Amino acid sequence: MGLEPSWYLLLCLAVSGAAGTDPPTAPTTAERQRQPTDIILDCFLVTEDRHRGAFASSGDRERALLVLKQVPVLDDGSLEGITDFQGSTETKQDSPVIFEASVDLVQIPQAEALLHADCSGKAVTCEISKYFLQARQEATFEKAHWFISNMQVSRGGPSVSMVMKTLRDAEVGAVRHPTLNLPLSAQGTVKTQVEFQVTSETQTLNHLLGSSVSLHCSFSMAPGLDLTGVEWRLQHKGSGQLVYSWKTGQGQAKRKGATLEPEELLRAGNASLTLPNLTLKDEGNYICQISTSLYQAQQIMPLNILAPPKIQLHLANKDPLPSLVCSIAGYYPLDVGVTWIREELGGIPAQVSGASFSSLRQSTMGTYSISSTVMADPGPTGATYTCQVAHVSLEEPLTTSMRVLPNPEQRGTLGVIFASIIFLSALLLFLGLHRQQASSSRSTRPMRHSG
């Protein structure tokens, strides 16, 4: 969010102060009133022709400001003291182009997310580019210009696309912008009016295989515009397909079970799509495209399908050393992490190296399976081996353990060897003592003298 430093600081301090207070009873959303507030965003103006709804990586871009004028925002106590955008009567060579956009004709449902993004530790990506009508229906259209702004709030925030039409209320002989060649207002802004917006609440969705998902997409349009069509398309790995379409009151599902509520579509501008019983074929980028009698805009939502792994640990063989096999089955996507840990009784757990893996297997559903094998060293008293599996579908790694004991035959052999060592040691000790006693008796025997 591109507030001037003083405004940004004031807003964040106000939010912090509101959060730090402890009122007797906090007002509910229904009790809170909406207060008209200017939302100011740092943007880039893209000066080359581009597709609707796409962001430029780099190239011909220049700095810009987007000022959404008097947007109704729920007042949580943090808006007190926030001043409206004043603009500047001086236009410098390196000053950013300022788009002043009225939102009187449409609703901005994600206004709070845009306003408080900076204070929430998030960022807003904003790009503005020229918008070209599909067909010019009136001669007066030739005297206007259109722009489309695409805004995304980071870390799972909403995404908004708005079509803005320039207003013709600039004074005769007004200063014109050097790049756009458009007349500027007395405050040095390009005055526009938002006539159409399309919003999605979440940029990326992760859902489990077999579950259901609702892909959010909503819109708001100015009076006089008619809704002509809604299309949901899926793009994945270079191919695209139509999932659902709605035109002039008729809906058609190309994907089995896909539904869109026509009453909500017409009453509240809710074009959300529901998909039941997700399969891996449902994974990809979903494009919600809304068409009106004059404008068209879209939102893109990536949907990731997840399948958590199931693990099982078993003993493969016992001779000469036991082998442990950890079977990991039914997971998606492909990447999985396997860690082996060994722990003796009363010892410190240690990671085991040298594990081998089987070839990767894929089921008819598209999920993956693999096995990991390690040679187990039970030691003299046994050891516990743990197979730990990490996957993107899991909040915490899965673990399974098995205690491995020494082979009974090996223990018997060791016992015989140990007993033999004790016997030989005792025998040697006995012989040594016997020899020592014999030597002592010879040295103490009386000597005979000849005479």
Curated annotation (Swiss-Prot):
Signal sequence region: 1-20
Q: Which domain of life is it from?
A: Eukaryota
Q: Tell me, what's a Pfam family for it?
A: V-set
GO cellular component terms listed in the entry, alphabetical order: endoplasmic reticulum membrane; Golgi membrane; plasma membrane
- Which residues are on the Lumenal side of the membrane? 21-412
Which residues pair up as cystines? C217-C288, C326-C387
Which parts pass through the membrane?
413-433
Q: Which residues form a coiled coil?
A: none
Record carries keyword rRNA processing: no
Extract one GO molecular function annotation from the record. MHC class I protein complex binding
Tell me which tissues or organs this protein is expressed in: Widely expressed.
List each copy of the Ig-like C1-type domain by range: 302-399
Which part of the chain is the Ig-like V-type domain?
Answer: 196-301
Output the SMART domains linked to this UniProt entry: IG, IGc1
Describe the function of this protein.
Component of the antigen processing and presentation pathway, which binds to MHC class I coupled with beta2-microglobulin/B2M. Association between TAPBPR and MHC class I occurs in the absence of a functional peptide-loading complex (PLC). Expression seems to slow down and down-regulate MHC class I surface expression.
Q: How does it assemble?
A: Interacts with peptide-free HLA-A*02-B2M complexes or those loaded with low affinity peptides, likely facilitating peptide exchange onto higher affinity peptides. Interacts with MR1 in a ligand-independent way; this interaction may stabilize MR1 pool and facilitate ligand loading and dissociation.
Q: Report the protein name in the record.
A: Tapasin-related protein
The protein's organism comes out as Mus musculus
